[in-house]
């Protein structure tokens, strides 16, 4: 069934809409679904970054006025091709990371151990669980309670690097705790001063 005139928007067209809240939205049509009356507009980035854009999903049932500024009549450009192997690799990596997290939880690893693992994994991808131990680059093993002194391995750059990561992790955790305590005490001080 063909859409009545004015109720169909071609990809690439420039449109302006006024919402029921009197907000004016303007942008390029990137998608339109006639049945659900949903319109996707590409607008300049609200962050102001030059190579970014905002995508707004607009339910046309809540729009009081739509104006087509520039109707695109020619065929829209073809969609960009997707690198399926890259997407599959990314999905596989994400799945492996989630399974690793699930393993750590099921193995009874402490929250501190899980957080340390995530911190190390951000820097060194070659990081895995071996029961409750963290194994980094097949060279360094960190055993519970996961402190610097629990880092074992052949003396060298790998062990030294992992120890530095562990030290920094616990410094950052301690700094965060101090900050949270001071923020928690602030309202108490203000309440005491006001009474």
Swiss-Prot record:
Residues 2-72 form the Sm domain. Coiled coil: none annotated. The modification N-acetylalanine is found at residue 2. Residues 4-67 are annotated as: Required for NAADP and TPCN2 binding. The keyword NADP does not apply. Keywords: Acetylation, Cytoplasm, Phosphoprotein. One of its GO terms (molecular function) is RNA binding. GO terms for cellular component: cytoplasm. The modification Phosphothreonine is found at residue 75. InterPro entries: AD, Lsm12-like, LSM12_ABD, LSM12_LSM, Sm. It comes from the Eukaryota. It is found in: Cytoplasm. Residues 80-174 form the AD domain. Belongs to the LSM12 family. Found in a complex with LSM12, TPCN1 and TPCN2. Interacts with TPCN2. Nicotinic acid adenine dinucleotide phosphate (NAADP) binding protein. Confers NAADP sensitivity to the two pore channel complex (TPCs) by acting as TPC accessory protein necessary for NAADP-evoked Ca(2+) release. This is Protein LSM12.
